[in-house]
Structures are given as structure tokens and as C-alpha cells.
Amino acid sequence: MKPRVLGMILAGGQGSRLAPLTLKRSKPAVPFGGKYRIIDFAINNFINSGVFSIYVLTQYKAQSLTEHIQRGWRFGTFLQDYFITLVPAQMYRYEELGAVWYRGTADAVYQNLHLIDNFNADYVAIFSGDHIYKMNVEHMLQAHMDARADVTIAAYPMPRTRAHQFGVMQVDDRWRVTEFLEKPQDPPGLPGDPDTSLTSMGNYIFSRRALEELLHTSISGEGEGFDFGHNVLPRALADGYHVQAYDFHRNPIPGQSSPNLYWRDVGTLDAYFEASMDLVSVNPEFDIYNPQWPLRTSSEFSPPAKFVHEAEGRKGQAFNSLLAGGVIISGGTVRDSILSRNVRTHSYSLVESCVLFDNVEVGRHSHLRRVIVDKDVIIPPGTRIGLDHEEDRGRGFTVTNNGIVVVPKSYTF
């Protein structure tokens, strides 16, 4: 009999390092790739893996995310175990504290244990909603069952110099976890490879009994911790639970012959920009065109992209770029850029290495270079952005350490 698997996506992250893109939306709701939201990749991983029972746990500035899920992610009304349901923080009442919001990743799940009970889950897959990657959850689940584990953690080998930003594991020769350290200042390396650490991707599969016991112990019982990485996983090891690591690099993706190496935490503006620019390269690391691993999102009703004018010096043209529906390149040039829905660039404008969100308009003779423009911005004719950072800062734009300029949503010139 096929096990009952419940998917839970943690989508309440604030994403403060992505400001100003997260001033009015949560991190999982940030647009990516011209037509997607960051959360779409976690949802697609579940659906492409045959997990159709999904709860999305939301908290911080969730309206944009709520509208996206409700508009674009719906199953038929007659399929009982096929659902994608939003679960906002509902001020769960603790006897000693009164009503509280989600206080951490583990607390978000703890406050919704009744959903797991009602579903009668055998296994619970708890995944982060703010990373860019593909993952065959079914393969990870099979590894979890084969190992007879209580908890399985998706693991990503990473250079030790960067591992301090993540949870780090030590494992034995069978990949059973022997130690878990959350964001250690001096991450341990792997045996035989001291320059590489085994980091947690923030994706877990729990056997239901172990999950319920650990959450009750960590949150409502003897413990005082509300986070999986800081509290629940170290507690699981201390209490003798079988905690297994799962090698993400061995995760098979249908239609992809190369090893599965791509996983990005686009938690900073520079990381977000770098991941975006990968998509427009000739051979991107992250392939969004694999028909055997479709990437669904909210349906768009925009007309096809359009290029107009062909006079010399005024040709509507784009090179090495992604253009969503409704885009009009009207006598301007676009290079190495991502243009989201209903963007319009006017004659003699030049857009280079940029990410433009929905409903951005670029005026005549304007020049943009290495710029992220949030939605609903009208850029006047002759405007230059990204070419003089002092001028950009004077307008109130964010300029990153790598020189990426960010224009906030609905900015008025």
C-alpha cells in the first residue's frame, strides 16, 4: 500500500536581506525568471514527485503570496487528497504565553499538528519555500524508508568557507548523522575532504511518530526551542533518533542526464541577481526547459511578446534574454536581461543585464545596466540607471556591494 505523504512548505520568511524586494512581500513571493515566484519551485518539486497534498505555512506580508497561490495553484474540487492549502499564522494560544505567532520553523509545524493528524500521514515532507532548485522528493522518501530513519535531512556538499551560513552535519560511512551544528563559526569538514562541509538544505522528511514526539518534547515539553536547525534536529540526535542525511547530488531528475548540483539560496540581492543572470546564459546551470520536469506557475493571460520597428538605429531587438507575455520591445535593445509580464521598452532605449518586474516601462533614450526594477515603475525618457552609483544612491536606490542597483516597487521619478 502506498504510504500517505503530506507536504508542508515553510513560506513565512521575511527575507530582510532581499529588501527592498521584500518590503511589501515575503521572500517566497519574490518574482523569479520572468514569470515564476520563488515558492513555485518547491511546489513543483512536490507535484512532479507525486506529492499532491500540500500545506503552505505563511506569516510575513503574505498577501502577494496568497493571491499567487489562490490564482494559480488549484486542483479539481472533487479530488479529496489533491490540495494546495494556505495556512496563515493564527495566533496559537499557549497556556503560559497566551496567543503567539509562528516563532520559528518548528513552531509553525507544531501549531498545525492537527492537520497532520487529520490527514493521517505516514510521512511528512517539510520543505523550505525560498530556494531555487529541482528535487525528486519521491527518491528522497524511498531513501528515508530504506534506511528506516526517523528523520532524513537533504544534504548539500559545500565549500567549507561558505558553510557557516547553514546547518552543518557530520555523518558516518552510511550517511547516518552523528552531529548537527546550526550555522557554526568554524564548520567541520568531511573526512578525507576537509575543505568541504555537508550542509542542510532545510528540507526534511519525518516519520510521523518521530515528528510528533520531537515537537512535543522540543516546544511544549522540556525544551524551549522553536527551530528545526537550532533545536529539533540536535534534540533528535541527543534522544537517540535515527537521523539520516540524503545526498542531494544523487537525486535523479527525469529528463536530466547530468548530476543534480544546482541549489541556490537567493537570500541576498547579489545572489538573486547572479541566479537570474544564469537563466539568460547560453548554457544555464538551471534548466527551465525540461519537459519531463515542468515548472508550472500561475496562468498568465497576457498576449505574446512583440518586437516592433526595424529602421536602422531603431530596431526592436533582444539578445540572450527571457521575455514574458505582454512584453513590447518598441525600437529599443535588450541584452542579457529578464523582462516580466507587460514590460515595455521604448525607442532608442538600452537595457543591459537587468531584471525588470511586471508593468515596468522604459522611456526613450534611457539606459539601464545591472539593475533590478520592481513592478509598476515608469522610467522617464533619457534616464540612466546603473551607470553612476552616486546618482543612483541620491535617488534613494539600493546599490549592493557588487554594484547591482535596485529600484523599489512603484517608485516615482
UniProtKB/Swiss-Prot annotation:
Print the keywords alphabetically.
Answer: ATP-binding, Carbohydrate metabolism, Glycogen biosynthesis, Glycogen metabolism, Nucleotide-binding, Nucleotidyltransferase, Transferase
Q: Pathway it belongs to? A: Glycan biosynthesis; glycogen biosynthesis
Q: Which SUPFAM superfamilies match?
A: Nucleotide-diphospho-sugar transferases, Trimeric LpxA-like enzymes
What InterPro entries does the annotation carry?
A: ADP-Glc_PPase, ADP_Glu_pyroP_CS, GlgC_bac, GlmU/GlgC-like_hexapep, NTP_transferase_dom, Nucleotide-diphossugar_trans, Trimer_LpxA-like_sf
Q: What class of enzyme is it?
A: transferase
Q: Where does alpha-D-glucose 1-phosphate bind?
A: 102, 167, 182-183, 200
Pfam families with a match to the protein in the record: Hexapep_GlmU (PF24894), NTP_transferase (PF00483)
Q: Name one GO molecular function term.
A: glucose-1-phosphate adenylyltransferase activity
Biological process terms in GO annotation? glycogen biosynthetic process
UniProt-listed CDD domains: ADP_Glucose_PP (cd02508), LbH_G1P_AT_C (cd04651)
Q: Cell cycle: is it a keyword of this entry? A: no
Catalysed reaction per UniProt? alpha-D-glucose 1-phosphate + ATP + H(+) = ADP-alpha-D-glucose + diphosphate
Superkingdom field: Bacteria
Q: EC number(s)?
A: 2.7.7.27
Which NCBIfam families does this one have?
glgC, PRK00725.1, PRK00844.1
Its biological purpose is as follows: Involved in the biosynthesis of ADP-glucose, a building block required for the elongation reactions to produce glycogen. Catalyzes the reaction between ATP and alpha-D-glucose 1-phosphate (G1P) to produce pyrophosphate and ADP-Glc.
Quaternary assembly = Homotetramer.
What family does this chain come from, according to its entry?
Belongs to the bacterial/plant glucose-1-phosphate adenylyltransferase family.
Q: What is this protein called?
A: Glucose-1-phosphate adenylyltransferase
Q: Could you tell me which species this protein originates from?
A: Deinococcus geothermalis (strain DSM 11300 / CIP 105573 / AG-3a)
Question: Lineage of the native species?
Answer: Bacteria, Thermotogati, Deinococcota, Deinococci, Deinococcales
